[in-house]
Amino acid sequence: MTAHATADTGLRGLDAGDLERVIEIDRTPGGRTRRRFFEKRFAAAAAHPEEFVHVGVMRGGALRGFAFARLLRGEFGREHVTAVLDAIGVEPVSRETGIGRTLLHELIARLRAVGARTLHSQTEWSDPELTHFFAAAGFKLAPRVALERSLATPLVEQIEED
Amino acid sequence: MARDTLTIPERVGDAQEISYASPAGPNVGALARDRIPVRAMKADDLRALVAIDRRIVGRDRSGYFQRKLAEALQESDVRVSLVAELDGHCIGFIMARVDLGEFGRVEPTAIIDTIGVDPDYRSFGVGRALLSQLIVNLRTLRVERVRTEVDWRDHDLMAYLERFDFAPSQQVCLDLDLVAAR
């Protein structure tokens, strides 16, 4: 990961020192965190920096937002580099101030710089704020469908062939 | 989820790593997973996985599978990826992830990344055995749901997954063309 920028405000890569702040920014209104997810992402990014692109926005000497993308090579049967937006977040008091757009703009620039040609993401259908954010950034509906199965019920099985 | 190839968990540390990918007990009847032995995926399965994938897609994706296997085995909190064997040979695999959340509880959603079946064994119920065992294992872990992504043009795969009670989720898949969107 890149070193911290020295400027009080601006854009920079993330490093291990940002872990707790990122977890805090990502905390849900209900208080739930994704500590394990971010611990693993930061560890993986430190071990394999060539597989991650990340950016943070500094204001007033503090990290106000972050974006994390993972690079995939050879997935989806393609040779070109694809990126997956793992996480993006802006602290609640700094929302509606353009930080999200700045983050995504910078992330896209960094992804292009490493040769990524597509950025994949997912959002909840019922989250109009995030859906609008992605739409305004130029995202389109992907030719993929997210399928889900509840595990509340067991699989009804019988002997049969595929 | 790629049709040809479909991964799950990440790791806290070796001491905390748990494997729940073992097959179910003997009280489940003569189901697909009983006829096709299914076991936990191991690091030395890489060569077999790459060979199956090569037969499906027609090219070598060793690098890609090396990363996916490392992700499934080393970055996962809970190892749930499986391999199907017949006569000692790997004939299929499913790569999936499920993470530990707060207080050591598993996250409610598991992700299936890749499933692959040797083309010579497509009528042997290998995919069913793998999916069936994965669902049993995830239910044992008290995971609430399992999710995957499928190319919307792959009607066969979508129909296949529907047979396992998969249905559209409330997640919307989005793409940004980084070449065009300048």
Name what the model sees in each region:
Chain A
Residues 1-17, 154-162:
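Conserved N-terminal entry element of GNAT/NAT acetyltransferase domains
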Residues 13-17, 24-80, 86, 91, ...:
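Acetyl-CoA-dependent GNAT
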Residues 72-74, 93, 126-128, 152-154:
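Short coil/turn motifs at secondary-structure junctions
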Residues 90, 96-109, 136:
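Conserved acetyl-CoA-binding loop-helix of GNAT-fold acetyltransferases
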Residues 95, 121-130, 148:
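Conserved beta-strand-loop-alpha-helix junction that forms the acyl-donor binding cleft
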Residues 101, 113, 125-143:
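Conserved active-site alpha-helix within GNAT-family acetyltransferase domains
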Residues 111-123:
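Conserved GNAT acetyl-CoA-binding A-motif
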Residues 137-156:
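Active-site/acyl-donor-binding loops of N-acyltransferases
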